[in-house]
Amino acid sequence: MTVQINKLDPDAAIDIAYDIFLEMAPENLDPADIMLFNLQFEERGAVEFVETADNWDEEIGVLIDPDEYAEVWVGLVNENDEMDDIFAKFLISHREDDREFHVVWKE
C-alpha cells in the first residue's frame, strides 16, 4: 500500500525555510556573511524553491527520496538573476505530521 504524500506548495516551503534561516543563521554563518546578507537582501536577496537534488546523501549521510522532500535555497542573486552566493540549502520533508529538515550552511 502506497501512502499519498501531500507535497508542500512552493510558498509554504519557502516560508518554512526562511523562518528557520532567520532563527539559525546567527549560530551557523560567519558574522561577515550575516552582515552581507542583511545589507544586500533588500536589493539582491532571494529564497528559491528548486528541484530537489538527488545527492543529499553526500551532505547528510543518508539516502533520501527526492519526491518526499522540498529543496529551498537562501542567498543573493547577481545582475543576471542567478543565485551566486548561497547562504543555506534546505531539505524539508513534505510530511506535515513528521516535518524534518536538513540544512547545509555556507562555509
UniProtKB/Swiss-Prot annotation:
InterPro entries documented for this protein: dsDNA_mimic_put, Put_dsDNA_mimic_sf
Organism: Mannheimia succiniciproducens (strain KCTC 0769BP / MBEL55E)
Lineage: Bacteria, Pseudomonadati, Pseudomonadota, Gammaproteobacteria, Pasteurellales
Residue ranges of the TM segments: none
Gene3D superfamilies linked to this entry: dsDNA mimic, putative
Family indicated by similarity: Belongs to the putative dsDNA mimic protein family.
A family per Pfam: DUF440
Name assigned to this protein: Putative double-stranded DNA mimic protein MS1016
Function: May act as a double-stranded DNA (dsDNA) mimic. Probably regulates the activity of a dsDNA-binding protein.
Top-rank taxon, per record: Bacteria
